[in-house]
């Protein structure tokens, strides 16, 4: 079967990029022919991409890398402006959020992509197609395919929550145009489905909506003994050494940061994801002195990139120096420090304001030595994570903003790391699927409530997990891994996408409470 996918962004990093890379790879493994429209100028470096199509000089040219061609990546000629959902930097592009685009810029972007889809479809005659993102993939396919090819839509949280919801007057009709012709609409969680239904206000949409969460590569993401995890971590550090890690989202010291970690002798806690305010990494940093006071050997590693990276480093420095006034200022300014409007980080502020008397003194004392082992790695490729995550005893997912699905939590669990996630939206739904794998006393450690007590709860859960007797913790790690491998796999995701595009919804799970 020939499958056309419109993504429109990169094929590495986090979130929807990883979803589309993994989906395309799974489709190829299942024997399908994939035609993937993206904006990754290094797409040809991926092992499953066999040809790359570009429009240099205005005409489509396809350069074959290897035969047989199973997957072709196409880069539509959109120019230098890349519309995004959250302000960030993208190498080679001027990134602008969709609301910042002029009407003319938006029209040019849509026309360029729809034209590319039309030309590719005329050339390869796809059997089914998939549009990603509520804005603007579905409308691009609706215009480019002109009703000739059945398609599904995959909803990712950012376009819905950051663009359509707050700017309905401008983007709602564009979203409706794209959804109207879809055979099925896939959401990662019940939470995302309900949010979509509310925003779209279409009484017929729930009947076409099905669960279609991301998956995990169960062959790559798996537990490793501590010695092997250490070897793989050092091998990853070696690969990064001398590489151009200081490019888009990377950091020059990534290799040294990873080489400094020793899972054989120290418990490692990690965060993997974008470094933006809504991901809640400030809560993890504030919790860390409380963890370090109980488990002095524990190490914290932050993996990712984003506009809030420097502020997070400044927050850690302020906490480590006992400068709670600066930490409180950071909490007060909030999103302003990543280029957005001022707005207090209320959960961080609540924690800092609650530190008084002896509790404040104990916290300042603990923080003084807590951050010496903190390491920032910058962006790592998704393909690097199977060599990183088995070295973690826990991975924290502290997002304060709704998430459509907790893919990072699933991948962490598959590797035997405790996936400690905020208890809301798609993260909570993932946690509910994993909790039955572990004993009753361990299950509450998988989540924390988003609220004024978040910092203390993160610290309590991490401390309790790291303090478990080794045999109980290892049994729980093995059970979490087995559970995630049973429930999530990319081959099933790929088959669900094809079924949704064809309108065969009866066999796909509905988003239920």
Region spans (language model):
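A charged, aromatic-enriched C-terminal amphipathic alpha-helix characteristic of glycosyltransferases
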Residues: 15, 452-457, 467-501
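A conserved catalytic-core segment of Leloir-type glycosyltransferases
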Residues: 35-124, 319, 328-376
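Membrane-proximal helix-turn-helix segments that form the acceptor-binding/catalytic region
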Residues: 168-185
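Acidic donor-binding loop of glycosyltransferase active sites
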Residues: 183, 352-353, 370-373, 390-404
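Carbohydrate-associated surface elements
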Residues: 191, 212-215
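Conserved donor-binding/catalytic core segment of Leloir-type glycosyltransferases
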Residues: 229-279, 285-288, 301-303
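Short hydrophobic beta-strand element within catalytic cores of glycosyltransferases
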Residues: 418-421, 426-432
